[in-house]
Amino acid sequence: MNIKNKLNIIKKYKYVSFDVFDTLVYRNVNKPEMIFSLVEKVAKENGLISPKCDFVKDRIMAQKLAYEISKYQEINLNEIYACINDQYLNVKQQLKEMELKIELDNIVPNKEIKEIYNYCINENKKIIVISDMYLSTENIMSILIQCGYKNINNIFISSEYRARKSTGKLYKIVQNELGVKNKDIIHIGDNKKSDFLMAIKSGIRAIHYKCNKISNLTPKQNIYRSEERRVGKECRSRWSPYH
């Protein structure tokens, strides 16, 4: 990515908005759903679930079901675990807390975007975070703070507002709540539809960030590559939670 070129574009905007996953931060796994595989591994090692349990499949199916029955555009983590297989009935809370911890433990900042963020801070830009994600605002802020993104002016998470970037509705909420004019805001994100096309459709200038995740991770951070085949089919489902 040509950082200098992006900074030249950003400099005229008062508000700079960032996507979270695969933009501000990366995970130390090749696929987002590999987090579920790590939860399964730790849960089995600690005797929390049976060795026969296929938690990865059950967790993905619970998320799919939660979307299907929800009356809102977005769901949250509590609703996902409310839909998980009854065999986890007595350990739902422990599994949910384990997932959040493993999520946090496997997050690293994106150095390229961090450079843009630091420029925005130095230039006194208003920093906004907009994410389509089932985690809570508190969860997302913990991730951002851990990665050094401490100066966030406003944060809009789809699970809290029950509206998504991918439909354009969350962008409208941002515009209305902040009273920001379209000419004063620009959004940066990796998802071509959610972060680029829908932002533009909503009247917001956008930069499509083409992430190169693997090159940003060290060999140590890629230790879970060998597990990818096991969950690959499920990982390619349309229910991927990260946009």
Predicted stretch roles:
Residues 121-128, 133-160:
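Substrate-recognition/cap helix-loop segment adjacent to the acidic, metal-dependent catalytic center
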Residues 3-57:
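Active-site neighborhood of HAD-like aspartate-dependent phosphohydrolases
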Residues 72-128:
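Short, acidic loop-to-helix structural element flanking the phosphoryl-transfer center
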Residues 163-164:
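Catalytic cores of eukaryotic secretory-pathway lumenal/extracellular enzymes that build
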Residues 232-243:
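Positively charged, low-complexity/disordered segments
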Residues 188, 193-221:
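Acidic, Mg2+-coordinating phosphoryl-transfer loop and its flanking beta/alpha structural elements
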Residues 168-193:
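Conserved Lys-Pro-Asp/Glu-containing loop-to-beta segment of HAD-superfamily phosphomonoesterases
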Residues 54-74, 79:
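N-terminal accessory alpha/beta regions
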